[in-house]
């Protein structure tokens, strides 16, 4: 039984892509019967054709300023509230909710996922109880890496706030991503927390992974943006805060703490145990800092450690050793 009809009211929407303006003619929907919280006669949003909105389930386009067109499909019990634009093959189904969102170009939103005040574009999947909110941008792109088939995914109970998630990134578990830039095939999962702010993002890229109960926290001063790159991993209960850059094959885990001023770690570095690194520190080439060891630079003076070695026990290093000098 049909639950709505296309009214005679029509409007044209312009959609710009690659510098070309495309025009779509839409019709407003009107409910023909009562269902869910909709009463017969209720006017809804605008669609290009009936294939855009299923007659089955309780799915509905609530706002009079919402538009669904160009092969997009709303089905199941999906809800579209506040002004939304759903287009170009996007699909919303299950119990998902789009609220003041722009969703397009093959994005698939399902289960109980929520997209609020955000943009989702490209062939990605957002599902489970995932939430994408507060002016986030999710821009999927495939074919840019060796894994040409991997799709960007945000799922489980992951929450993304005010962040930019692009390419083939994966965010899942109970991960909390605030004011971050996640790109390429980077992954944030389990109970990891990324805490950027209005001044500085947390940047995770390449094939880096943040997981366990790790926390990456941006500072409030200029250039206090933590950057996790290449195949680096941060996990366990590790904390990284401020101007820190992790490059090739860096592992920070257990209860290690790194506080940037700035800190740069590169080439098979392990910071673990209860170790602490702080200040203007550069560590490279197969150095392990573990146990209760502390590497601390004072007054902005640079401290440089390099070459295969293990710093352990209660070692406390505050200046560049002669053997480690540049």
Spell out what each predicted region is.
Residues 1-58, 64, 77, 83, ...:
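Terminal amphipathic alpha-helical/low-complexity segments used for targeting or macromolecular assembly
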Residues 70:
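Glycine-rich active-site/cofactor-binding loop and its immediate structural neighborhood
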């Amino acid at each position: 039984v049909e639950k709505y009809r296309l009214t005679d009211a029509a409007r044209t929407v312009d959609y710009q892509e690659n510098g070309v303006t495309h025009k779509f003619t839409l019709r407003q929907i009107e409910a023909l019967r009562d269902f869910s919280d909709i009463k017969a006669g209720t006017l809804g949003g605008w669609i290009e054709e009936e294939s855009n909105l299923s007659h089955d389930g309780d799915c509905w386009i609530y706002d009079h300023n919402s538009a669904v067109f160009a092969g997009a499909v709303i089905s199941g019990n999906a809800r579209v509230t506040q002004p939304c634009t759903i287009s170009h093959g996007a699909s919303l189904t299950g119990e998902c909710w789009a609220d003041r969102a722009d969703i397009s170009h093959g994005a698939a939103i399902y289960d109980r996922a929520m997209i609020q005040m955000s943009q989702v574009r490209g062939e990605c999947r957002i599902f489970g109880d995932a939430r994408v909110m507060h002016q986030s941008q999710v821009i999927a792109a495939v074919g840019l890496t060796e894994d040409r088939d991997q799709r960007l995914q945000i799922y489980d109970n992951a929450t993304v706030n005010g962040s930019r998630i692009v390419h083939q990134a994966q965010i899942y578990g109970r991960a909390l991503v605030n004011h971050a830039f996640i790109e390429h095939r980077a992954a944030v999962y389990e109970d990891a927390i990324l805490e950027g702010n209005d001044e500085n993002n947390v940047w995770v890229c390449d094939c880096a992974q943040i997981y366990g109960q790790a926390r990456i926290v941006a500072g409030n001063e200029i250039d206090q943006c933590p950057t996790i790159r290449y195949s680096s991993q941060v996990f366990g209960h590790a904390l990284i805060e401020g101007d820190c850059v992790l490059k090739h094959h860096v592992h920070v885990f257990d209860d290690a703490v790194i506080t940037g001023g700035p800190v740069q770690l590169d080439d098979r570095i392990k910071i673990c145990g209860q170790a602490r690194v702080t200040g203007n520190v550069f560590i490279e080439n197969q150095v392990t800092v573990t146990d209760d060891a502390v590497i601390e630079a004072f007054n902005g003076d640079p401290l440089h450690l390099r070459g295969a070695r293990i710093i352990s026990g209660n070692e406390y290093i505050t200046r560049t050793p002669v053997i480690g000098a540049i």
